[in-house]
Amino acid sequence: MEILYSPAKINLGLWIVDKRPDGYHEIFTLYHTLDFYDRIIIQEHPFLEVKTSMPEIKQEENIVYKAISLFESYTGIEQNLQVIIEKNIPVGGGLGGGSSNAATVLNYLNKKHDNILPEEKLFEIAVKLGADVPFFLKGGFAIGEGIGEKLTFLPKTLNEEIFIIYPNIKSDTKTVYSKVDKSILTNKGDLNIILSLINEYDIKKLEAYIENKLGNIALDLYPEIKEAYDFLNYLGFSPKVSGSGSCVYVIGRPTAEVEKAAAIKGWRLIKTKLK
């Protein structure tokens, strides 16, 4: 039996730079993994079975099942395994839990089979599974471009404390992206300040310029997200939405007021750090 830990991520910032003819959007985003995980248990089994603590997700629709199936197709090696995913990362929160699960299992399978697939083939599989999956093959701190799959991994990571509010609502990424119009597109030249600050690894300097244009749409679509965001603003924090939502994050530690509000509102408060 093997136990794997599958990390969450945060989009520290996200800018939309273009809309492609195929309907997808070109983005510029800053990915960073968190010290916060799902747990995955893998053991030998008579046949492939993927189970999760969310029984409403059918096996064939589970991204981990799809990842294993693609690995089988690329290698010709049948995987008779039972995979049990214990979810801790909120679903639909913009923290990449499912994508991380898929990448973690892909890395495990490739290592188990003596790195049968070169890195570029693993990335090829990851891109087929979803825009965030390639990032999780390595994790750490990275710039994501294209639809998020064109990655520049930075040599160092940040380690600041961070807290996250999950307002107990799932944000639908497709719905959020469908509301993007030309008025919120960012000229890539305007991101030069971000590129220069990244190399200083100073989150406080970077934070002053970080935006999430997609998150602004999520705030308009989901009153629950806006309520958490506005509350943190009221307390003097600089909250940001992660990805397309629904999680709202703040660099630093939560105050007693945040702890109390989370308990009253039924929000999930996650205290972690960049890793």
UniProtKB/Swiss-Prot annotation:
Listed pathway(s): Isoprenoid biosynthesis; isopentenyl diphosphate biosynthesis via DXP pathway; isopentenyl diphosphate from 1-deoxy-D-xylulose 5-phosphate: step 3/6
Annotated catalytic residues: K9, D132
Keywords: ATP-binding, Isoprene biosynthesis, Kinase, Nucleotide-binding, Transferase
Biological processes annotated in GO: isopentenyl diphosphate biosynthetic process, methylerythritol 4-phosphate pathway; terpenoid biosynthetic process
Residues that, per the record, bind ATP: P90, V91, G92, G93, G94, L95, G96, G97, G98, S99, S100
Substrates-to-products reaction catalysed: 4-CDP-2-C-methyl-D-erythritol + ATP = 4-CDP-2-C-methyl-D-erythritol 2-phosphate + ADP + H(+)
Source taxon at top rank: Bacteria
InterPro entries reported for this sequence: GHMP_kinase_C_dom, GHMP_kinase_C_sf, GHMP_kinase_N_dom, IspE, Ribosomal_Su5_D2-typ_SF, Ribsml_uS5_D2-typ_fold_subgr
Record's keyword annotation contains Transmembrane helix: no
Keyword rRNA-binding on entry: no
Cross-referenced Pfam families: GHMP_kinases_C, GHMP_kinases_N
Record-level Gene Ontology MF annotations: 4-(cytidine 5'-diphospho)-2-C-methyl-D-erythritol kinase activity; ATP binding
Enzyme Commission (EC) number: 2.7.1.148
PANTHER family found in the cross-reference section: 4-DIPHOSPHOCYTIDYL-2-C-METHYL-D-ERYTHRITOL KINASE, CHLOROPLASTIC (PTHR43527:SF2)
Role of this protein: Catalyzes the phosphorylation of the position 2 hydroxy group of 4-diphosphocytidyl-2C-methyl-D-erythritol.
UniProt xrefs under NCBIfam families: ispE, PRK14611.1
Assigned protein family: Belongs to the GHMP kinase family. IspE subfamily.
Annotated protein name in UniProt: 4-diphosphocytidyl-2-C-methyl-D-erythritol kinase
Gene (name only): ispE
